[in-house]
């Protein structure tokens, strides 16, 4: 937990030193062969796997403000999809879903937390639906989902795109989306606009022609099959269609969570990196509770046991939040689950009188009077001033006479 808190405190400082951080971490890069092409990838860090999927306009560099920071605590992979960055152009029909699966296979990624930006979010959803065992959590950023429509407002950019034919000219398209479009990048985020131009001018989007193979089934119709923790992020000033898509995703995926990032358009990781990173790390650092909420007690315990097998001293939760979840379960009548949560809390925080007091209360509600007495006594031993434990013991032991 100390390491987690330290990481959060350092985010602001690190964001001003990303270049030096990227130089400091060891980045492995290269190409993997896929059916009819090559994909360029970069990989850094150690720990749980994270895979970063870029949007439909830029390339892997959209994650420049996140890649080195995430690599401090995770094994992070980012790559250019076909037609982007350093990856090859398609010469035959190809599937982004199967390309991503090859990233997993060839880079020895058993399971990963997948970040998907815009169209990359749609890919993340489609991949999760086809290969559910490979994805442990999703972070969807300005995501659009296949199978849900786009309005005319999206097509003409709210009337701001006067001549759609201009977008066939790469330079005119760059100028429009960087400086004229009110949705792609919020007007005040000038540095993000400059970065956007730099990325596109160095690696302009290439057409996939008729080679792109869509998903077997539209993701929008099958969102309820996704049962993992999902965080949905949308920029305050993103185009209304993207907000609509995010609503469809949130409604469709059980227990998913949506947040709005202020003062941002579509490209949140470029526009508001500090707010984005803070929100993402909060989600990542609460993964035990995310799993508990979305998948239930058994999955959360399994996650905890796997983590403890690698590091017996690891603390994956805050004492106060675990206590709050325990009482939430008590209120919902999930007494057995509440007991298990409070037991985990005293195991993680054996010096906490409050943790033992709460466990005693749960045991009492579960009808386990002897265990309640034992834990109230432990609480009182740790804190002789705990009047609640003293009163409870007087009543419980008096009832034994």
Where are these regions (language model features)?
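Conserved HGGG/HGGXW glycine-rich cap/lid loop of the alpha/beta-hydrolase fold
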Residues: 37-86
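Active-site loop/oxyanion-hole signature of alpha/beta-hydrolase fold enzymes
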Residues: 78-115, 119
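Flexible "cap/lid" loop of the alpha/beta hydrolase fold
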Residues: 129, 138-167
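Short beta-strand/loop motif that positions the catalytic acidic residue
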Residues: 226, 232-234
């Amino acid at each position: 937990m100390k390491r987690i808190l330290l990481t959060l405190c350092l985010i602001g400082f690190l964001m001003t030193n990303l270049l030096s951080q990227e130089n400091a971490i060891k980045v492995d890069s290269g190409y993997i062969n896929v059916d009819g092409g090559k994909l360029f990838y970069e990989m850094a860090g150690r720990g749980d796997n994270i895979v970063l999927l870029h949007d439909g306009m830029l390339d892997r560099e959209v994650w420049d403000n996140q890649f080195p920071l995430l690599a401090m605590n995770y094994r992070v992979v980012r790559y250019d999809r076909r037609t982007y960055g350093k990856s090859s152009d398609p010469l035959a029909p190809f599937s982004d879903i199967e390309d991503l699966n090859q990233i997993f296979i060839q880079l020895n990624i058993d399971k990963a937390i997948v970040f998907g930006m815009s169209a990359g979010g749609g890919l993340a959803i489609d991949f999760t639906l086809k290969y559910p065992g490979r994805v442990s959590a999703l972070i969807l950023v300005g995501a659009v989902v296949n199978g849900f429509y786009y309005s005319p407002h999206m097509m003409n950019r709210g009337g701001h795109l006067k001549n759609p034919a201009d977008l066939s000219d790469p330079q005119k398209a760059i100028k429009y989306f960087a400086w004229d479009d009110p949705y792609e990048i919020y007007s005040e985020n000038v540095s993000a606009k400059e970065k956007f131009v730099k990325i596109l001018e160095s690696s302009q989007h290439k057409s996939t022609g008729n080679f792109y193979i869509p998903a077997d089934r539209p993701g929008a119709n099958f969102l309820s099959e996704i049962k993992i923790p999902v965080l949905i992020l949308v920029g305050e000033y993103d185009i209304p269609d993207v907000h609509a898509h995010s609503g469809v995703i949130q409604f469709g995926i059980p227990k998913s969570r949506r947040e709005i990032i202020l003062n941002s358009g579509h490209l949140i990781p470029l526009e508001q990196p500090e707010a984005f990173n803070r929100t993402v790390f909060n989600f990542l650092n609460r993964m035990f509770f995310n799993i508990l909420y979305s998948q239930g007690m058994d999955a959360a315990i399994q996650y905890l046991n796997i983590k403890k097998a690698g590091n017996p001293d690891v603390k994956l939760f805050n004492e106060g939040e675990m206590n709050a979840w325990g009482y939430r379960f008590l209120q919902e009548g999930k007494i057995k689950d509440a007991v298990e949560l409070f037991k985990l809390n005293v195991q993680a925080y054996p010096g906490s009188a409050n943790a033992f007091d709460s466990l005693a209360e749960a045991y009492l509600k579960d009808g386990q009077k002897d265990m309640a007495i034992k834990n109230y006594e432990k609480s009182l031993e740790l804190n002789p001033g705990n009047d609640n434990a003293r009163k409870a013991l007087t009543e419980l032991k008096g009832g034994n006479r």
